[in-house]
Structures are given as structure tokens and as C-alpha cells.
From Swiss-Prot:
GO MF entry, a single one: N-methyl-L-amino-acid oxidase activity
Name of this chain's protein: N-methyl-L-tryptophan oxidase
Organism: Salmonella dublin (strain CT_02021853)
Enzyme class: oxidoreductase
Free-text comment on the cofactor: Binds 1 FAD per subunit.
Recorded name of the encoding gene: solA
Length: 372
């Protein structure tokens, strides 16, 4: 059987692509080396932030707004909501370049963002402490996503729509010819007109020339009471320390508040190098500088987890066809800020498989930027 689209890697982007391409009427085969959702990629840990006024650059905002529409639609397929509109407050020094980008994105796209000085910030959320020179940019319409629930939902919807799924089967080789793409797996060979490579952290095992660096990252859950929950209107947050370190976190659930550090981590080259949480001496204490200064009422570390970022050299996404192979799209280099975009990236992949030109300007995400 020849498929219209084979998806190599069915985590966040791959799961979304499988659903949207199948829904569009294509014959799709989704593959994954494991059984998604799983612990081997970048999507586990229950929750991910979603922010609209994007500190990483205005080029992301159109993608973000489309992604939000798709998240809202996906949430209707579950009794438990996938998107929780908790609001997100971005904390940092008044001269922060990241916050300046947030403000610029909000102004350009007329997004609902409220600026609070340090006093107003601590008055609204007495649990938060910041220096006098800090500000907060509060996005009331943003919040967080239930990442594993989202992937489970996409997989179910794709399967119900007739999508073929081959999991726990690693792709060992990809062959290109005039008729399309053939993949080799432990279960045999499969052929399609087009392919999406969304293999996340270990994409270089299949495409060694891609400029992607795997980074081991950790996040942890700390003891917190009801003051830090959505029931008390406590928001999700990002926070920049005076030394430039960037943290992110979520409202407490079941008296546990999840927090992680966005920068830093350990460069790795193979899956076995991603040691479990607490295997690196600094893991348990990584969030202490932020908690001690900004959220002093939070208690001790309860448990944590390790994941992996697939970092590109400039930490911007890679969305492009493989050089010399126009029938193969690669989406990688999401650099620790990609999950919130998963539905729109999946839709872009479905449009690619349909032969449609994307309605988004994807020029900033081309591979050619690294050779200029």
C-alpha cells in the first residue's frame, strides 16, 4: 500500500499532523520508536505553557493565534479541557529584552496584555515578591496545556478517522526516489508520496546534517498550598532573574507547583546520556534562586523529571523541506518552546502533504538561514 504521507515521530507535532492530514482525506501512516505519549521526548510532564504575546519574536504570533484556535477546537473533544485559561504573567527587569518583545508583539497584534509595576504586581498576587525595578506583563487570555492529554486525543481522533499507526517500531533508514519516500522499520518497509520528519531530539540519527543539539533539561514539583492554585486565580508564569536566567512555572495542582529553568541544561549526544532527575547534583536545586526570591512561600522539592530540548543554533524553529528532497518536510529545532505550536505545525504539515502553499510566512524558519 502506498500512503500519501508517512510521519516519522508521533510526539507533539507528529500526532497533530497525523490527525489533521487524515481529517483532510489523506492516507496517513504515523510511526514512532516508542508508544506515544511517552517519556523519551519533550512532551511529558503533564503541562506546557501557552503564551500569545511572544517574547521570542513577533514572527511567531500569527502561528500562535492559529494554534490557539486549534487548541480551543481540540478541547471540545474531551470532557477534561486540554487548554486551561489561567493567565500568564511574565516577570522581569523593566529593561528586559524578552519583555520588550512581549510588549512589542502585544502592541502589533492588539493582544490583551496588562503592564504592572512591582507594587501592583505584588498587590494582585501577594505570593509573588519582586525587586522595585521589576515589571509584570500579564496575558489574561493565555494559560497552560495538558500535553499528554493532547497527544492522546490527537492519536485517538486520527485512529478513529482511519489513520494507520505503527508504534514501538524505530525507523532505521529513509530512501528517496522519483516516486516518493520509503522508510525501513523493524516491521518492514513502507512507501508514501511524501514524508514528515518530526522525530524531535534524535532527528540527527536519520538526518545527520541537521543543525540540532540535544540538551538534557529538568523540571520539578514543589510543595505548595491553595494560595498558588487557579482557584485562587494564581497564574502560570515566566520569570527572568537579574543575571538573565529564565524560569517558567504553573499554578499548583494537588498542592504541587511545577517549575523549570528554560536556559542551561547539559549538552548530550545519545538517549542514554539523558540521565533521570537527580542524577545530576544540581537538579534538585536548579529552581531555588527563583523560588527563594520570587515565590518564598513554596516548600521543598517533591519530585522531578528529565526531558530533552532539540535546540537549533538560534533557538528558532526549523520548518523546511530537506535540501534536494522536496517531498520530505522536516519540523525540528523547537528549542524548548514548541509544544504550544503543535497544532498549527501539524496543520502546516498536512497542507504540505496536500500540495498546498502555507498561508504563513515560513521564511524565518528555513534551513538556508544557517548557511548565510
Amino acid at each position: 500500500m502506498k500512503y500519501d504521507l508517512i510521519i516519522i515521530g508521533s510526539g507533539s507535532v507528529g500526532a497533530a499532523a497525523g490527525y489533521y492530514a487524515t481529517r483532510a482525506g489523506l492516507k496517513v501512516l504515523m510511526t514512532d520508536a516508542h508508544m506515544p505519549p511517552h517519556q523519551q521526548g519533550s512532551h511529558h510532564g503533564d503541562t506546557r505553557l501557552i503564551r500569545h504575546a511572544y517574547g521570542e519574536g513577533e514572527k511567531y504570533v500569527p502561528l500562535m493565534l492559529r494554534a490557539q484556535t486549534l487548541w480551543d477546537e481540540l478541547s471540545t473533544h474531551n470532557e477534561e479541557p486540554i487548554f486551561v485559561r489561567s493567565g500568564v504573567v511574565n516577570l522581569g527587569p523593566a529593561d528586559s529584552a524578552f519583555l520588550a518583545n512581549v510588549a512589542r508583539s502585544a502592541q502589533q497584534w492588539q493582544l490583551n496584555v496588562e503592564r504592572l509595576d512591582a507594587t501592583a504586581l505584588m498587590t494582585r498576587w501577594p505570593e509573588i515578591r519582586v525587586p522595585d525595578n521589576y515589571i509584570g506583563l500579564f496575558e489574561a487570555d493565555s494559560g497552560f496545556l495538558r500535553s499528554e492529554l493532547a497527544i492522546t486525543t490527537w492519536l485517538r481522533l486520527a485512529r478513529e478517522a482511519g489513520c494507520a499507526q505503527l508504534f514501538n517500531s524505530q525507523v532505521s533508514h529513509i530512501h528517496h526516489d522519483d516516486n516518493g519516500v520509503t522508510i525501513e522499520t523493524s516491521e518492514g518497509s513502507y512507501h508514501a508520496s511524501k514524508a514528515l520528519i518530526s522525530a524531535g531530539t534524535w532527528v540527527k540519527a536519520l538526518v545527520p546534517e541537521l543543525p540540532v543539539q540535544p540538551v538534557r533539561k529538568v523540571f520539578a514539583w514543589f510543595k505548595a498550598d491553595g494560595r498558588y492554585s487557579t482557584k485562587n486565580r494564581f497564574p502560570a508564569f515566566t520569570g527572568e532573574m537579574p543575571n538573565g536566567d529564565q524560569y517558567y512555572g504553573f499554578p499548583a495542582e494537588n498542592d504541587e507547583l511545577k517549575i523549570g529553568k528554560h536556559n542551561g541544561g547539559q549538552l548530550i549526544q545519545a538517549p542514554e546520556e539523558r540521565k533521570p532527575f537527580a542524577a545530576v547534583a544540581s537538579d534538585g536545586a536548579e529552581a531555588f534562586p527563583f523560588l527563594r526570591n520570587v515565590l518564598p512561600g513554596i516548600g521543598g522539592c517533591l519530585h522531578g523529571a528529565a526531558c530533552t530540548y532539540d535546540n537549533s543554533p538560534d533557538e528558532n524553529f526549523i520548518i523546511d523541506t530537506l535540501p534536494g528532497h522536496e517531498n520530505t518536510l522536516v519540523i525540528t529545532g523547537l528549542s524548548g518552546h514548541g509544544f504550544k505550536f503543535a497544532p498549527v505545525l501539524g496543520e502546516i504539515a498536512a497542507d504540505f502533504a496536500l500540495g498546498k502553499t502555507s498561508s504563513f510566512d515560513l521564511t524565518p524558519f528555513r534551513l538556508s538561514r544557517f548557511s548565510q
